[in-house]
Amino acid sequence: MSSALAFSQRVVKGSQAYDEKGVVYIQGEKTPYTGVLQNINEKGILESEAEYKDGKMNGFSKLYYPNGKLGSEATFKDNVQDGLQKDYFEDGKVKLEIPYKNGKVEGTAKEFYPNGKVFVEATYKNAIKDGYEKSYYETGVLQSEKIVKNGKMDGFSKLYYPNGKLGSEATFKADVQVGVQKDYYESGKLKAEVSYKNGKVDGVAKAYDETGKVIEQVTFKNGVQVK
């Protein structure tokens, strides 16, 4: 015959707890709390709950909608967020995914449409955007993409039509637009060319019809039209 020991975590209402210099205690107790703290509103509905060990958040942390559905879940280690945070729509589908490491966003964060398709995804390093950032139409077709370095646009930036065709392409350096921006018709034909220098229009700007004929031409110097 075999036997098993069942372990049940202690569960206490948040109203019975207090925080002293980042360490949680239960009123009337001298030992830092280990167990689950639950915040319940005046209607008796669970709003949030979190795991604690030795007075610090260690384990899951969850937030709930008024209907009882899970709204958000995250993981903590010694009061510091660590791991993948997931936020949910009220119907239970994932709304956000945000990776944390030592309390800072680290990795690829994603936001979703209610239909489950990715809306936006961006890469973070040490809580700062660094890498590719992309957005999508609700159909799943790429809407935009750009390169970000240390929180600033640095490299190409492209916009797309709902049919997937390129609509515009530009270049940035430390958040400042440089080089030639090209805009396109949905057919793929060139629509306009505009030169940028240090974030200002500089040079000859041209607009085209879909046959490729120049229909407008203007010259700029340091952002000011000169011809």
What do the predicted segments below correspond to?
Residues 4-227:
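Glycine/tyrosine- and acidic-biased, solvent-exposed loop/turn segments at the edges of beta-strands
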